[in-house]
Amino acid sequence: MSVEDGGVPGLGRPRKARWTLMLLLSTAMYGAHAPLLALCHVDGRVPFRPSSAVLLTELTKLLLCALSLLVGWQAWPQGTPPWRQAAPFALSALLYGANNNLVIYLQRYMDPSTYQVLSNLKIGSTALFYCLCLRHRLSARQGLALLLLMAAGACYAAGGLQDPGTTLPGPPSAAATSPMPLHITPLGLLLLILYCLISGLSSVYTELLMKRQRLPLALQNLFLYSFGVLLNLGLHAGGGPGPGLLEGFSGWMALVVLSQALNGLLMSAVMKHGSSITRLFVVSCSLVVNAVLSAALLRLQLTAAFFLATLLIGLAVRLYYGSR
């Protein structure tokens, strides 16, 4: 099974074990993100600017990449540094930045539950760009696996967790603010489609870029996160008056920033040595971690929809990565 098909890079057991451990760590960090953010709340709200968290996360990624090159964890390319190859990463940073900001604006035109369910369409858009841009064909089994993955995400978003104090299943945020009627405006639908397309394009474009360039991963990340820091610094500065960069931060928030930075680096390795499809499975499997941590830390109840979503994810993994 090749890397492009979603297989494990390399045949040796040590490398396979490292790859598996990396995917498990990434899944755990993805799943822990929302529960850790919930633990940061003070009086029911986030005490810091979201742009501050994003900027500090990008800055942490940049510093870790620079450190890995300086101490020799990854070799610096011989000869003149290929700075011209940095330019294409500006588009990656722009796509990721647009995607992150669209998430915020989408909440104005639809309720959280509708967003959580319909945003799973980005799985389909990623698969579409994966086939068009990377010229990989998905088998019928793989296509069915991705459909099951979309269904699992929608099922979990619609009712995987429930606040014991309410009778309305759904995402914790939706349950806590109920009753909010399900709704989406025409503009919201257009923005959601745009969000899903940009999400798929950004993932596949970055994968294509990282695989075509014969540069160390740390140097490619250095290019990507340099543009990311500049972009998010501009967004933070242009966001108007508000809390300072470090105002409202706590130990929990520092853990969120560090875990997201490390997860970003792990995902870049998946994009270079694995595929965008592998990333989709990591994100989907993280729903299980998210639910278990939410139940343990936030005292939310798991519902039948959670177990159905878990079953669908397991079937999807078996179909996509199982023997053909």
Curated annotation (Swiss-Prot):
**Looking at the Swiss-Prot or TrEMBL record, what is one Pfam family this protein matches?**
Nuc_sug_transp
Choose one Gene Ontology CC annotation of this protein and give it.
Answer: Golgi membrane
The superkingdom of the source organism is Eukaryota
Q: Name one GO biological process term.
A: transmembrane transport
Reactions catalysed, semicolon-separated, are: CDP-L-ribitol(in) + CDP(out) = CDP-L-ribitol(out) + CDP(in)
Residue ranges, Lumenal compartment?
40-52, 107-141, 202-214, 272-275
Please indicate if the UniProt record lists Membrane as a keyword: yes
Annotated function: Mediates the transport of CDP-ribitol. Does not exhibit CMP-sialic acid, UDP-galactose and UDP-N-acetylglucosamine transport activity.
Put simply, this protein is called Probable UDP-sugar transporter protein SLC35A4
- Gene name, per UniProt, is SLC35A4
